[in-house]
Amino acid sequence: MESRMWPALLLSHLLPLWPLLLLPLPPPAQGSSSSPRTPPAPARPPCARGGPSAPRHVCVWERAPPPSRSPRVPRSRRQVLPGTAPPATPSGFEEGPPSSQYPWAIVWGPTVSREDGGDPNSANPGFLDYGFAAPHGLATPHPNSDSMRGDGDGLILGEAPATLRPFLFGGRGEGVDPQLYVTITISIIIVLVATGIIFKFCWDRSQKRRRPSGQQGALRQEESQQPLTDLSPAGVTVLGAFGDSPTPTPDHEEPRGGPRPGMPHPKGAPAFQLNRIPLVNL
């Protein structure tokens, strides 16, 4: 029973001591601090009085020399002498550009100097010689920079780069897509087939126009070759094939050869019977 009561008695004695926890703690000692120790401030130089012309005593503090800068990356600055060309690389690129930043940058160089034949008084003294910044090392000039300069009278641009060559006249081993040649070949075949179809259609229409004119001429020629018959009432009456009565003929029948010369014409014969064509029974 006593073992169960002693924790309650201990808690009742410690409960009035809880306000002591709110008291501020004392600052830590300097020796026990884990933070780095700051260097002490430099002592000021002694105060010097002003000159005798000063109206009152003025305390002039002498200026301390500026701290020396630690040279991390030494940069050699070149002095440009009069009459010489500026350096090919701008300031800060003498030792080469950094390898991790902008490896594709183009460094523009100077113009053509007097030694190369350039005229500083002219409007165009020369070309800007450019180079490509390599990731490790100095900037390299363009390989065709010498061929791009002019001879004096005109400008010679040199050979055009391979990317500007036409694809039809360039070499086949330069990475030209073979599908381009297939497309051009198919297009030419389609144009030729369409042209042949158009010519065939025009030829058929011209032949159809010539056939009706030829048929009409043949019919006219056949009609002119058929014999003519006299169907006048005074002429000969044509009976059918089953007729019993004989065919009446006129009293004076002209011979088939027509009237002979020197023979008198019969009296009472009509004038149209002289040139009558003989009848042909079909």
Curated annotation (Swiss-Prot):
Mainly expressed in adult brain and cerebellum. Weaker expression in fetal brain and virtually no expression in spleen, heart, kidney, liver and dorsal ganglion relative to brain. Residues 1-31 form the signal peptide. Residues 200-282 are cytoplasmic. One of its GO terms (biological process) is glutamate secretion. Glycans are attached at residue 140. The keyword Cell membrane does not apply. O-glycosylation at Thr-140 is essential for recognition by PILRA. It is a single-pass type I membrane protein. Acts as a ligand for PILRA in neural tissues, where it may be involved in immune regulation. This is PILR alpha-associated neural protein.
